[in-house]
Amino acid sequence: GSSDFLAVAVREVKEETGVEKPFPQSGAILSLDVLPVPAHEKHGKSVECHKHYNVTYGLIVNPKEKLRIKPDENSAVQWIPVENLKEMVKEQHMLPIYEKLIARMRKQKQMQTEVMAQIAAPLLTWYPSHARDLPWRRTKEPYRIWLSEVMLQQTRVEAVKGYYQRFLENFPDVQSLAAATQDQVNKCWEGLGYYTRAANLRKAAQVICTEHRGVFPDTYAAVRRLPGVGEYTAGAVCSICYEQPTPAVDGNVLRVIARVTDCFCEIDRPAMKQAVTEGLRAVYAEGNCGMLTQSLMELGATVCLPNGQLLCSACPLAAFCMGRKNQDVLRLPQRTTKKKRRTEQYTVFLMRCEGKYAVQKRQEKGLLHGLWEFPNVPGIHTAEEAIQMAASWGTAPKDLVRTAEKKHIFTHVEWELFGVYLDCGRAAEPFVWKSPEEIAAEISLPTAFRQFALDLP
């Protein structure tokens, strides 16, 4: 009864064969056929001759997936090499149909490859008049391009602009960044999140100064070896700064390519990213590598948007976009099922003594390791329990000023935070005690804790 034939095809493959993760090669219908079915017996009952109206799609399955017999539908399920099909097919009258469908799947694959080969020219024509004026696009200096790409990971462009300018004012080159303390770098990064990026920036700057004599490396392999630099960042730096054919493939680019080729492979699988990277490498034009990288980024950020925002009429690739032709844009890209974000609870202590508040560096490995924080303990405790804990730390709590509930969301975890503001009689160790002005000027607090600092009485 469903009108979504593709969804029915995927469901039937799962039910008939037992495979768990089939995906369409394309959303296009391979064939529409009317097939006569002769009279036969099924489960001991006579079935009169009739017709099957077949809508056929080509699906891809990992051959390592286990097959399962469904007794009421089939007696055997197995993988058959295409070259053995003729010998293995029991119903020889179906062989021409199967051969036709296999040929069409191969044709679909060829069309997807041909579409990839067409994208460069229209993108290079479109980009100069549609590119946003962003500060890091006014340079090809590798230090600045590298910095911008690291900042833009998991962060909106508008949020990055101010941080980018401020960071360069404090650390205008790789030498000044290498010479800075991690606290100085973190303070400049404060509020941008994902502080591991800031730590790796400083480590990479030190590597550049010690191993490359302060000169930013100019090969993909050398850039890739820098701490915290992945395939995407290395590809962006080398294509934009050095005009090397090194694609920078992120979620935006994967979405564009999945749609333009009508590819249903889950984009967060490494094999998909690798295939797109190799496909793009083949179409990079000498002398235009940087512009092609930036045009793909721009298209994914401004036109080929996620979440059902269709701007296909403004897309330079619309004329040959297979996803648009097959009306699959809203289906794409496909992703693996995300795990539900877990929730953690903490009680946060805002302990004040003579106008100064207790802070400490986070010792726990993992999230926010090594960063400044207000003292905290797992779980949501009552104010009375919190006062007892503060007393056990030697801070001599005198008055409960107030409490506050906050929340902070990371990529994979959500923190529920209960803040307890206490007036204390003793600035106990090992806490470091800072005034609100000193906190604002000297130390970097992650956003989860900085939201409490904004409300300090």
Regions found by a protein language model. Name each.
Residues 107-133, 138, 301-457:
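Intrinsically disordered, low-complexity, charged terminal extensions of DNA damage-control enzymes
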Residues 12-16, 73, 149, 298, ...:
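Acidic-residue sensor for enzyme active/binding pockets
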Residues 2-93, 383-456:
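Unchanged
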Residues 122, 126-311, 320-322:
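Catalytic cores of DNA base-excision repair glycosylases
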Residues 86, 90-109:
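C-terminal tail/extension regions appended to the core domain(s) of diverse proteins
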